[in-house]
Amino acid sequence: MLKELINKLLWHPDYNPEDYNITYLHRGAKNDEKAVPLKNIVIEDSFLVFDETHVPFHRILEIVNLKTGEILYKKR
């Protein structure tokens, strides 16, 4: 489901990837969280890739619409 949501936000003409941020678990960062703009992400198998960083899907904490503040995904 998460991979499908990200693909939809990246490729569906109704959505603009520049409007979304993905927050993920990153040990050592402030609050162990880091955020990256969706527009910088490439999907490979079970990972998100950006700037040579690989983030497994299970580390994704939240996907937020930056314009509206709507949370599209939040890890339980």
Curated annotation (Swiss-Prot):
Task: Tell me which Pfam families the record gives.
Answer: MJ1316
The organism's place on the tree of life at top rank: Archaea
InterPro entries hit by this protein: MJ1316, UPF0248
What family does the entry list?
Belongs to the UPF0248 family.
Know the name of this protein? UPF0248 protein MmarC7_1289
Gene source species: Methanococcus maripaludis (strain C7 / ATCC BAA-1331)
